[in-house]
């Protein structure tokens, strides 16, 4: 019995250390991203995406997420949703699993489901500039243009050199001007 308790304690302590280590790395990268407005920002962005897409403690979940991503690339969207949903059931605290499923919901036109998953992503990782950009796209589809602009501006606050956010803000502002004429 004592060995079982020690094993369980070791598992939880190790799991916490891996998750904590990943969070520290993300904090450093986000500080760099915010202060660096150069070509290096794309390298920092890539490192952040790699950390987000790697489960901190369970390699099998990372493999499942990769499998779902490949299904998306092959346009097998319903199966991808099933894979991402399974990952979410196993670890509902992994923001990137929610983000992947939100992306697929957006791709199939399920904008409200996509928004619901994006809300969960941002609850778990408020700095998720990808989810904020996705939220902008969802709000454009729902014709909530002011909300879309807010989402992109939040993304720009986190990632100042995010060009796609800058482009989308301008396009939405132009769209709003056209509608008021």
Feature map (PLM): residue ranges:
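A conserved position within tetratricopeptide repeats
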Residues: 33-34, 49-52, 88, 122, ...
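N-terminal leader/linker segments that initiate helical-solenoid repeat arrays
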Residues: 17-66
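TPR/TPR-like (Sel1-like) alpha-helical repeat modules
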Residues: 27-37, 140-175
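Register position in tetratricopeptide repeats
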Residues: 54, 73, 107, 141-142, ...
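Boundary/linker segments of alpha-helical solenoid repeat arrays
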Residues: 39-42, 56, 129-130, 159-171, ...
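Alpha-helical adaptor scaffolds
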Residues: 58-125, 130
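Sec-dependent N-terminal signal peptides
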Residues: 4-13
């Amino acid at each position: 019995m004592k060995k079982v308790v020690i094993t369980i304690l070791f598992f939880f302590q190790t799991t916490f250390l891996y998750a904590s280590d990943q969070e520290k790395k993300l904090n450093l990268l986000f500080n760099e991203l915010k202060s660096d407005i150069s070509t290096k920002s794309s390298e920092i962005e890539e490192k952040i995406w790699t950390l987000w897409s790697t489960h901190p403690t369970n390699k099998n979940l990372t493999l499942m997420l990769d499998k779902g991503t490949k299904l998306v690339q092959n346009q097998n969207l319903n199966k991808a949703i099933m894979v991402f949903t399974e990952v979410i059931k196993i670890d509902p605290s992994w923001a990137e699993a929610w983000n992947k499923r939100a992306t697929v919901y957006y791709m199939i036109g399920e904008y409200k489901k996509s928004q619901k998953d994006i809300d969960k992503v941002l609850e778990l990782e408020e700095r998720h500039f990808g989810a904020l950009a996705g939220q902008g796209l969802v709000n454009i589809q729902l014709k909530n243009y002011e909300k879309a602009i807010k989402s992109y501006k939040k993304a720009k606050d986190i990632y100042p050199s995010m060009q796609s956010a800058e482009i989308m803000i301008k396009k939405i502002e132009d769209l709003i001007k056209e509608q008021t004429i």
